[in-house]
Amino acid sequence: MTNFLIVVATVLVMELTAYSVHRWIMHGPLGWGWHKSHHEEHDHALEKNDLYGLVFAVIATVLFTVGWIWAPVLWWIALGMTVYGLIYFVLHDGLVHQRWPFRYIPRKGYARRLYQAHRLHHAVEGRDHCVSFGFIYAPPVDKLKQDLKMSGVLRAEAQERT
């Protein structure tokens, strides 16, 4: 039971970690170089942004190895990171960005809220003034729309296009 709780706790900590990395590194001056590819239209199977997943996979692989040899708790933490990575792949890459061979757009419930929240994240050009940086948790869509409206960024972008 303890190992299961370690995995669940790690998934929750990974959501906080992913939010922080997404908000302050990927959308900051340090990480925008990789993440920018995710906010641009393209027809490639992969994006430079996918390197972030590779970084977390390397960390998990190291933790699996160290956990197997010296500190078993690290193995379970690595498993939690891997579970989070799978959830991320299904929800973000699959559901939201349709990076799988079939198309599915959720019509209601949690999946719909997650889908809409991340679409609103992409409603802004560039790295500033975006909303909704988590991947498993999404704030209420009405609040995100209000935040975007209050920022004035959508009006400014609409005026630039005319």
UniProtKB/Swiss-Prot annotation:
Pathway(s): Carotenoid biosynthesis; astaxanthin biosynthesis
Record's keyword terms, sorted: Carotenoid biosynthesis, Oxidoreductase
GO terms for biological process, alphabetical: carotene metabolic process; xanthophyll biosynthetic process
Region forming the signal peptide: none
Database matches in Pfam families: FA_hydroxylase
Enzyme Commission identifier(s): 1.14.15.24
Sequence ranges assigned to domain Fatty acid hydroxylase in this UniProt record: 8-135
InterPro entries the UniProt entry points to: BETA-OHASE-like (IPR045019), Fatty_acid_hydroxylase (IPR006694)
Catalytic reactions of this protein: all-trans-beta-carotene + 4 reduced [2Fe-2S]-[ferredoxin] + 2 O2 + 4 H(+) = all-trans-zeaxanthin + 4 oxidized [2Fe-2S]-[ferredoxin] + 2 H2O
GO molecular function: beta-carotene 3-hydroxylase activity; iron ion binding
Acyltransferase listed as a keyword: no
PANTHER family in the record: BETA-CAROTENE 3-HYDROXYLASE 1, CHLOROPLASTIC (PTHR31899:SF9)
Function description: Catalyzes the hydroxylation reaction from beta-carotene to zeaxanthin via beta-cryptoxanthin.
Family label: Belongs to the sterol desaturase family.
Protein's UniProt name: Beta-carotene hydroxylase
